[in-house]
Amino acid sequence: MNVDFGNALAAEAVTGVSEASLERLDDRVADAHDRIEANIEARRFGYASLALPTDTDPDAIYEAVSGFDPEAVLTVGIGGSALGAETITAALGAESHYTLDNVDPAPTRQLLDELPLSSTLVNVVSRSGTTAETLANFLVVREAMADAGVDWTDRTVVTTGAEGPLRTLADAHDLPSCTVPEGVPGRFSALSAVGLLPAAALGCDIEAVLAGGAAGRESLAPSLFESPAYAYGAVAYATEQRGATTNAIVPYAEQLEPFAEWFAQLWAESLGKDGLGQTPARALGATDQHSQLQLYRAGRKDKLVTLVRPRERAGVDIPETDIDALSYLGGESLESLLDAEFEATEASLAAAGQPNVRIELDSLDAHGVGELLYGMEAACILYGELLGIETFTQPAVEWGKRAARGLLGGGDFEEAEAVADKTVRRVE
């Protein structure tokens, strides 16, 4: 993975950062790097995620899925319990991985009606084992399996903490299971069993994913000028300080579209503290050049645009044509067209003074996706260090969870009373 932040410099962008200020910031990056390294070694909460490439045991994951040869994998989880796995399987082309990460009844019913439940591996993921959406969906899935004549205990694997309702369930029914690693928040758990199990069940090389993460670990250095991950985290921080309060993540590869969703959770939930942090926006190149690019180029100069692409792509040739107006396309390829659009977008943003950063992978393979995920996690952690916030908590999210649980009769929570006290001004 490499990072090019030339278009985020003050010479190119309205909210860009000067070379001199980056030199000054680099002293803080060095100090933050030392703290991060010490916390990784101590496996402190949150920082332990940066040790996952070596701490994760791929054999334990393969063992958990060894009794299955699924036609499909259905992950029942939400947030970090689903997005990392979805990112990895999508990037690696494992199309038979599905997720239930919402409790919208219509798509849930449609998916369960379409899946071959007798040959589907159901992967239930919740660190606490108490996540309301996950448990509700699992109960719905279990009933659908029973209605289809499938013994759910024969087709279910669990990833959860060492204790909790899901762990109790797994032990009671002797279900194959993996343990969510200690000290790793869900949104940082992609390089653990949480993110890797569906890929392993579908025959992907999770050891190569971990090797990519290990390469990302090796690339961390006490200078933003020597570490791609820290370069990105530091430049994102510096541009936010200059008014770039939105970070638009734009992969130029459809297989990375779930990565943008994963990134949005990572960035928002980790950095949205104390009135600080960048708001993540998601787009897809080249599709959203025909929608969002107008805003990014001609709207407010309050954005950092992050463009992501693999250098190597599959080849699809564009046929020659006798239509004069289309002759410039004939003999080219879809990948050359997509790369041209990437570079044109990058240049157009720079010409408009909108800071942008290029992130490139050698190729979109198991090693590449592992390195990308690790790099973004390290960048996020560095950003949090520079902001001086608690990166690994999510108190605002917990408020909503308590309110919802109280409304459903799952306990006496004062947050639920705030919902009842809502001011109503309805127009009908």
From Swiss-Prot:
The keyword Membrane does not apply. Keywords: Cytoplasm, Gluconeogenesis, Glycolysis, Isomerase. This is Probable glucose-6-phosphate isomerase. Pathway: Carbohydrate biosynthesis; gluconeogenesis; Carbohydrate degradation; glycolysis; D-glyceraldehyde 3-phosphate and glycerone phosphate from D-glucose: step 2/4. Its EC number is 5.3.1.9. It catalyses: alpha-D-glucose 6-phosphate = beta-D-fructose 6-phosphate. Its main location: cytoplasm. GO terms for molecular function: carbohydrate derivative binding; glucose-6-phosphate isomerase activity; monosaccharide binding. The active site is at 269 (proton donor), 290, 401.
